């Protein structure tokens, strides 16, 4: 918030993680639920679930949805009164909680939702294929309505993307950090921002 960041996405659990042994997965799910509850209770940020929530155990999915609901500001504060436009600077920071998230899964879900929407409107498959655009898919992603990430921080020293925000990160800058996520400190974040600020972004040009 102090650095003017408007949107942050925390990837807490991938779709691949869901195939772990139950004895290993259960404690991890408890940790995630507790962490999201704590984020919601602060009242400082708007939370949004990003992922295939239907793949999660139902008790966890319900708990996460409840936490997200608690984090939403009053309508008057979020949208303004009587049509008043609210300055984006006055809105709480958006924190995306990526749980049950996979980049390929997100794109598949976006295309599936788009096809269902067009079919309900009476369009044929041929008509959908003829008119399909990148913007159509973007508008059906989990993060629809949000800007693409400027910076992706990969912790734990791994030199791979693991499918994180595959569609959205086409022009993102990447920063690889040796520190594991639970030990990630403010100073590590500031180093990442400093490194990012020193780069000349070409945005595909």
Roles of regions detected by a PLM:
Residues 1-205:
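Flexible, compositionally biased loop and terminal segments
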């Amino acid at each position: 918030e102090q650095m003017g960041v408007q949107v942050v996405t925390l990837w807490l659990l991938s779709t691949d993680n869901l195939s772990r042994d139950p004895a290993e997965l259960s404690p991890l799910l408890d940790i995630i639920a507790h962490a999201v509850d704590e984020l919601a209770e602060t009242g400082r940020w708007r939370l949004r679930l990003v992922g295939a929530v239907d793949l999660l155990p139902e008790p966890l999915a319900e708990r996460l949805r409840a936490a997200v609901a608690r984090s939403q500001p009053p309508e008057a504060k979020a949208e303004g009164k009587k049509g008043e436009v609210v300055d984006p600077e006055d809105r709480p920071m958006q924190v995306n909680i990526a749980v049950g998230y996979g980049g390929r899964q997100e794109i598949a879900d976006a295309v599936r939702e788009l096809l269902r929407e067009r079919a309900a409107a009476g369009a044929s498959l041929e008509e959908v294929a003829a008119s399909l655009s990148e913007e159509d898919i973007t508008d059906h992603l989990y993060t629809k309505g949000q800007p693409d990430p400027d910076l992706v921080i990969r912790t734990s020293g791994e030199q791979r993307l693991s499918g994180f925000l595959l569609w959205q990160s086409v022009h993102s800058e990447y920063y690889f950090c040796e520190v594991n996520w639970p030990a990630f400190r403010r100073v590590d974040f500031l180093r990442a921002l400093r490194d990012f600020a020193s780069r000349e972004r070409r945005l595909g040009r």
